[in-house]
Amino acid sequence: MRESRKLDSAALYLCTDARRERGDLAEFADAALAGGVDIIQLRDKGSAGEQRFGPLEAREEIEVLATLADAARRHGALFAVNDRADIALAADADVLHLGQDDLPLTVARRIVGDRIVGRSTHDLDQVRAAVGEDVNYFCVGPCWPTPTKPGRPAPGLDLIRATAALGTDKPWFAIGGIDAERLPEVLDAGARRVVVVRAITAADDPGAAAQRLAGMLSAAG
């Protein structure tokens, strides 16, 4: 499957909100993807746009995802839906990302079929479970506390080191508070793929920020 090959080579994963308060999602996504983002995921929970306009309704979310889908396909990248298997199916998403408390994997698979499915993990037991279950990739963290997930303890780089020591062939991404300044520490801990949020979404030049991160990841191999 072409999408699986794209996942195998993916190193830079971006989570973004819908940027409703700025109204620049299409331009932002295009710049970030041109800069080297491999996977772009919509996650609007807790965003400035949600605080101002309220939660995205399903119809609105599908419209936002259409913008991301268009940009991702023009740049040969993958686009992901957070949590909602029904939205992933309706939007024809490449990827569904599940948290620990989201829909059970078996149910999600019945809805999205053989689409790429990922899983969040926050301790070594969850990492081991993700290695063994029918997910295509998993995320490990948070490496540092982050406002995206307020109140969630950060297991830190020790969990990244422990995950790297497992030597799994399944793709996995470090996540949580990662930016260009902290990325060398994450790479030293053994990760070769990362998820970022504010490192690109809050950048004055999202394309340049993505390009810098992608270059560092590429150099690390």
Swiss-Prot record:
Binding-site list for 2-[(2R,5Z)-2-carboxy-4-methylthiazol-5(2H)-ylidene]ethyl phosphate: 146-148, 177
MF term (GO), any: magnesium ion binding
Gene field: thiE
Positions with a binding annotation for 4-amino-2-methyl-5-(diphosphooxymethyl)pyrimidine: 41-45, 82, 120, 149
Family: Belongs to the thiamine-phosphate synthase family.
PANTHER family, per database record: THIAMINE-PHOSPHATE PYROPHOSPHORYLASE, THIAMINE-PHOSPHATE SYNTHASE
Disulfide cross-links: none
GO cellular component: cytoplasm
NCBIfam families the record matches: thiE (TIGR00693)
InterPro entries from the UniProt entry: Aldolase_TIM, ThiamineP_synth_sf, ThiamineP_synth_TenI, TMP_synthase
Keywords, ordered alphabetically: Magnesium, Metal-binding, Thiamine biosynthesis, Transferase
Enzyme nomenclature, EC number: 2.5.1.3
Coiled-coil ranges per UniProt: none
Name listed for the protein in its UniProt record: Thiamine-phosphate synthase
Residues that bind Mg(2+): 83, 102
Note on how the cofactor is bound: Binds 1 Mg(2+) ion per subunit.
Reactions accelerated catalytically: 2-[(2R,5Z)-2-carboxy-4-methylthiazol-5(2H)-ylidene]ethyl phosphate + 4-amino-2-methyl-5-(diphosphooxymethyl)pyrimidine + 2 H(+) = thiamine phosphate + CO2 + diphosphate; 2-(2-carboxy-4-methylthiazol-5-yl)ethyl phosphate + 4-amino-2-methyl-5-(diphosphooxymethyl)pyrimidine + 2 H(+) = thiamine phosphate + CO2 + diphosphate; 4-methyl-5-(2-phosphooxyethyl)-thiazole + 4-amino-2-methyl-5-(diphosphooxymethyl)pyrimidine + H(+) = thiamine phosphate + diphosphate
Source domain of life: Bacteria
